Amino acid sequence: MSYRLIIGIVPHNAGDEIVKAAAKAGARGGTILMGTGTASSNILSLLGFGSAGKDVVMILVEEDIKDAVVSEIVESTQTKKKSFGVLWTLNVSRFIRCGNERGGKTEMNTAADHQLITLIVNKGYAEDAMAAARSAGA
């Protein structure tokens, strides 16, 4: 089975609208992350990235419904301002495999030079958490 990851960057608090439109077209839901832009320019403003606060929306769908989901998202945002945001898709089928597709073999290299630390903090504390991580060597 083939999968596509739909990624959108939209104004802050507009992510729910994107996920609802996707669900209406058959998606099973989505993930909304709070994003913060760091650069400002006329080009970024033209692309819809003018203000710093953004929602990054990720929706995983099967290939056969991708076009319907994207169309529903675009249609649901047509009444918004011209530069509402940006939307694109990635083919992630090679990254997503069911356990039985590889015969149950473990192919992960357990020796790693890096570690992933995931942290969930209350709204407004992200910069404090990042500052603490950087001071600890991250």
Question: What does each model-found stretch correspond to?
Answer:
Residues 1-138:
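Positively charged, small/polar-rich N-terminal and surface patches that mediate targeting and assembly
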